């Protein structure tokens, strides 16, 4: 398995796996399938091009012949928040879970974060129904620091998200 930062050339692969994530696990993401579909592959390619051009943001992909997992990394840009970054959009399809793909993606994002001067912490949120993802985050040192009740609403059903953080200064 190879984990690397995605480029514009990976737009179609990212597009397909992200659409699958939003279709198969809609409660785990803030975006909807329809919202992402509207962006189109051209919008995805532009986003990946922008991310690879900005040294602090990256989208990671795990490949085992084809793409088998994704996660995003975005550093806060405001001066008072520039010491923080966020993990977003992490997804590994059900049939690929349990093979260490999510762990490899997160380890790549954490290693990347440690190369960025002044970055002190990485935050993420995880929907409480994603027990395996939560356990993975804890195993890599993320610590819970809060709970956002009713963080997401899908078809009149609410989903709570646990807020977690990894201290890079330790």
Regions found by a protein language model. Give the residues of each.
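Extreme N-terminal starter segment of soluble prokaryotic enzymes
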Residues: 1-3
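Acetyl-CoA-dependent GNAT
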Residues: 8-9, 15-16, 20-89, 93-95, ...
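Short hydrophobic/aromatic beta-strand or adjacent loop that forms the aromatic wall/cage
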Residues: 57, 159-163
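Glycine-rich acetyl-CoA-binding "A-motif" of GNAT/NAT acetyltransferases
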Residues: 66-69, 132, 158
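Conserved glycine-rich acetyl-CoA-binding loop
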Residues: 80, 89-107, 116, 128-135, ...
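Conserved GNAT acetyl-CoA-binding A-motif
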Residues: 113-125
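Conserved catalytic-core motifs of GNAT/GCN5-like acyltransferases
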Residues: 123-126, 138, 143-159
């Amino acid at each position: 398995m190879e984990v690397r930062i995605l480029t514009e050339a990976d737009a179609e692969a990212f597009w397909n796996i992200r659409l699958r994530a939003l279709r198969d696990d809609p409660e785990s993401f803030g975006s909807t399938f329809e919202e992402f579909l509207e962006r189109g592959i051209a919008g995805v390619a532009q986003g990946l091009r922008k991310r690879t051009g900005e040294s602090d943001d990256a989208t990671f992909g795990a490949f085992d012949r084809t793409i088998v997992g994704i996660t995003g990394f975005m550093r806060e840009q405001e001066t008072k928040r520039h010491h923080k970054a966020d993990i977003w959009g992490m997804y590994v399809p059900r049939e690929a879970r349990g093979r260490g793909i999510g762990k490899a993606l997160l380890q790549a994002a954490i290693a990347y974060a440690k190369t960025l001067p002044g970055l002190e912490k990485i935050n993420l949120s995880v929907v409480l129904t994603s027990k395996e993802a939560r356990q993975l985050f804890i195993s890599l040192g993320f610590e819970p620091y809060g709970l956002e009740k009713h963080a997401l609403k899908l078809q009149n059903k609410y989903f709570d998200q646990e807020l977690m953080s990894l201290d890079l200064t330790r």
